[in-house]
Amino acid sequence: VTNHCLICDRIKLIQENKNPYFVRELSTGYVVLGDSQYFEGYTLFLSKHHVTELHQLAPAEKLAFLEEMSLVQEACAKAFHADKMNIELLGNGDAHVHWHLFPRHNGDTAQPGPVWWTPMDVMFGDDVIKDMPRLNRLKAALGAALDEVLKVRATDDGVKKLNQGD
Protein backbone atom coordinates (compact mmCIF):
# COMPACT_ATOMS: atom_id res chain seq x y z
CA VAL A 1 0.00 0.00 0.00
CA THR A 2 1.39 3.39 -0.99
CA ASN A 3 0.36 6.91 -0.07
CA HIS A 4 -0.84 7.47 -3.63
CA CYS A 5 -4.28 6.07 -4.42
CA LEU A 6 -5.63 5.86 -7.97
CA ILE A 7 -9.21 5.44 -6.70
CA CYS A 8 -8.89 8.59 -4.57
CA ASP A 9 -7.58 10.36 -7.69
CA ARG A 10 -10.66 9.19 -9.63
CA ILE A 11 -12.96 10.39 -6.84
CA LYS A 12 -11.24 13.78 -6.87
CA LEU A 13 -11.91 14.01 -10.62
CA ILE A 14 -15.58 13.21 -9.94
CA GLN A 15 -15.74 15.98 -7.35
CA GLU A 16 -14.21 18.37 -9.90
CA ASN A 17 -16.67 17.26 -12.63
CA LYS A 18 -13.74 15.92 -14.69
CA ASN A 19 -14.36 12.16 -14.69
CA PRO A 20 -16.10 11.17 -17.95
CA TYR A 21 -16.95 7.72 -16.53
CA PHE A 22 -18.96 9.04 -13.55
CA VAL A 23 -22.62 7.96 -13.47
CA ARG A 24 -24.05 8.61 -9.99
CA GLU A 25 -23.18 9.46 -6.40
CA LEU A 26 -24.85 7.32 -3.74
CA SER A 27 -24.60 7.73 0.02
CA THR A 28 -21.60 5.39 0.43
CA GLY A 29 -19.90 5.52 -2.94
CA TYR A 30 -19.62 6.56 -6.56
CA VAL A 31 -20.93 4.59 -9.55
CA VAL A 32 -18.61 4.77 -12.56
CA LEU A 33 -18.32 2.87 -15.80
CA GLY A 34 -15.04 1.07 -16.31
CA ASP A 35 -12.42 2.60 -18.59
CA SER A 36 -12.75 -0.50 -20.75
CA GLN A 37 -16.10 -1.58 -22.08
CA TYR A 38 -15.00 -4.82 -23.71
CA PHE A 39 -17.58 -6.39 -21.39
CA GLU A 40 -20.31 -3.89 -22.11
CA GLY A 41 -21.61 -2.28 -18.95
CA TYR A 42 -18.53 -3.01 -16.82
CA THR A 43 -19.16 -0.84 -13.76
CA LEU A 44 -17.30 0.02 -10.58
CA PHE A 45 -18.67 1.16 -7.25
CA LEU A 46 -16.03 3.16 -5.37
CA SER A 47 -16.21 3.60 -1.60
CA LYS A 48 -16.27 7.23 -0.51
CA HIS A 49 -13.87 6.36 2.27
CA HIS A 50 -10.33 5.23 1.69
CA VAL A 51 -10.06 1.89 3.42
CA THR A 52 -8.22 -1.12 2.09
CA GLU A 53 -10.59 -3.79 3.43
CA LEU A 54 -14.36 -4.00 3.69
CA HIS A 55 -14.20 -4.85 7.41
CA GLN A 56 -12.46 -1.51 8.07
CA LEU A 57 -15.68 0.41 7.37
CA ALA A 58 -17.87 1.23 10.37
CA PRO A 59 -20.57 -1.47 10.76
CA ALA A 60 -23.51 0.68 9.62
CA GLU A 61 -21.54 2.08 6.68
CA LYS A 62 -20.38 -1.39 5.69
CA LEU A 63 -23.96 -2.67 5.56
CA ALA A 64 -25.11 0.40 3.62
CA PHE A 65 -22.19 0.01 1.18
CA LEU A 66 -23.06 -3.65 0.60
CA GLU A 67 -26.73 -2.83 0.10
CA GLU A 68 -25.94 -0.02 -2.34
CA MET A 69 -23.56 -2.31 -4.25
CA SER A 70 -26.45 -4.76 -4.58
CA LEU A 71 -28.66 -1.98 -5.97
CA VAL A 72 -25.92 -0.97 -8.44
CA GLN A 73 -25.59 -4.63 -9.44
CA GLU A 74 -29.34 -4.86 -10.03
CA ALA A 75 -29.34 -1.69 -12.13
CA CYS A 76 -26.33 -2.91 -14.10
CA ALA A 77 -28.06 -6.23 -14.81
CA LYS A 78 -31.21 -4.43 -16.00
CA ALA A 79 -29.44 -1.78 -18.07
CA PHE A 80 -27.22 -4.24 -19.93
CA HIS A 81 -29.58 -7.25 -20.05
CA ALA A 82 -27.09 -9.50 -18.27
CA ASP A 83 -27.52 -13.25 -18.28
CA LYS A 84 -25.35 -13.30 -15.13
CA MET A 85 -23.50 -10.72 -13.05
CA ASN A 86 -19.90 -11.21 -11.89
CA ILE A 87 -19.08 -9.14 -8.81
CA GLU A 88 -15.63 -8.80 -7.28
CA LEU A 89 -13.97 -6.88 -4.47
CA LEU A 90 -10.26 -7.30 -5.13
CA GLY A 91 -7.94 -4.42 -4.26
CA ASN A 92 -4.66 -6.09 -5.11
CA GLY A 93 -3.84 -3.39 -7.65
CA ASP A 94 -5.74 -0.45 -6.16
CA ALA A 95 -5.91 -0.81 -2.37
CA HIS A 96 -9.11 1.22 -1.89
CA VAL A 97 -12.36 -0.68 -1.38
CA HIS A 98 -14.24 -0.82 -4.69
CA TRP A 99 -16.46 -3.32 -6.46
CA HIS A 100 -16.07 -4.57 -10.02
CA LEU A 101 -19.44 -5.43 -11.58
CA PHE A 102 -19.40 -7.25 -14.91
CA PRO A 103 -22.61 -7.93 -16.83
CA ARG A 104 -22.02 -11.28 -18.51
CA HIS A 105 -23.72 -12.79 -21.52
CA ASN A 106 -23.78 -16.35 -22.76
CA GLY A 107 -20.89 -16.78 -25.19
CA ASP A 108 -19.09 -13.52 -24.28
CA THR A 109 -15.83 -15.45 -23.86
CA ALA A 110 -14.44 -18.40 -25.80
CA GLN A 111 -14.72 -20.59 -22.69
CA PRO A 112 -16.96 -20.02 -19.68
CA GLY A 113 -14.89 -18.46 -16.92
CA PRO A 114 -13.83 -15.22 -15.28
CA VAL A 115 -13.36 -12.04 -17.29
CA TRP A 116 -9.69 -12.08 -16.32
CA TRP A 117 -9.11 -14.99 -18.71
CA THR A 118 -9.50 -12.43 -21.51
CA PRO A 119 -6.05 -11.17 -22.58
CA MET A 120 -5.39 -7.74 -21.04
CA ASP A 121 -4.41 -6.20 -24.40
CA VAL A 122 -7.84 -7.24 -25.73
CA MET A 123 -9.85 -6.28 -22.66
CA PHE A 124 -8.19 -2.88 -22.29
CA GLY A 125 -7.55 -1.97 -25.95
CA ASP A 126 -7.42 1.75 -26.80
CA ASP A 127 -10.31 1.47 -29.25
CA VAL A 128 -12.55 0.26 -26.42
CA ILE A 129 -11.53 2.97 -23.94
CA LYS A 130 -11.87 6.08 -26.12
CA ASP A 131 -15.32 5.56 -27.67
CA MET A 132 -17.11 8.52 -26.02
CA PRO A 133 -20.47 8.25 -27.86
CA ARG A 134 -20.71 4.63 -26.71
CA LEU A 135 -19.65 5.60 -23.18
CA ASN A 136 -22.33 8.30 -23.02
CA ARG A 137 -24.99 5.83 -24.23
CA LEU A 138 -23.93 3.32 -21.57
CA LYS A 139 -23.93 6.01 -18.85
CA ALA A 140 -27.47 7.02 -19.83
CA ALA A 141 -28.67 3.40 -19.76
CA LEU A 142 -27.13 2.76 -16.34
CA GLY A 143 -28.41 6.07 -14.97
CA ALA A 144 -31.97 5.25 -16.07
CA ALA A 145 -31.77 1.77 -14.55
CA LEU A 146 -30.42 3.24 -11.29
CA ASP A 147 -33.36 5.67 -11.24
CA GLU A 148 -35.74 2.73 -11.62
CA VAL A 149 -34.06 0.57 -8.97
CA LEU A 150 -33.73 3.43 -6.49
CA LYS A 151 -37.37 4.44 -7.03
CA VAL A 152 -38.54 0.90 -6.31
CA ARG A 153 -36.28 0.82 -3.26
CA ALA A 154 -37.74 4.10 -1.96
CA THR A 155 -41.27 2.75 -2.51
CA ASP A 156 -40.39 -0.52 -0.75
CA ASP A 157 -38.93 1.41 2.21
CA GLY A 158 -42.09 3.52 2.42
CA VAL A 159 -44.27 0.41 2.45
CA LYS A 160 -42.10 -1.15 5.17
CA LYS A 161 -42.42 1.99 7.30
CA LEU A 162 -46.21 2.04 6.83
CA ASN A 163 -46.41 -1.63 7.79
CA GLN A 164 -44.30 -0.96 10.88
CA GLY A 165 -46.53 1.93 11.89
CA ASP A 166 -43.85 4.62 11.44
Per-range role (PLM):
Residues 1-166:
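HIT superfamily nucleotide-processing domains
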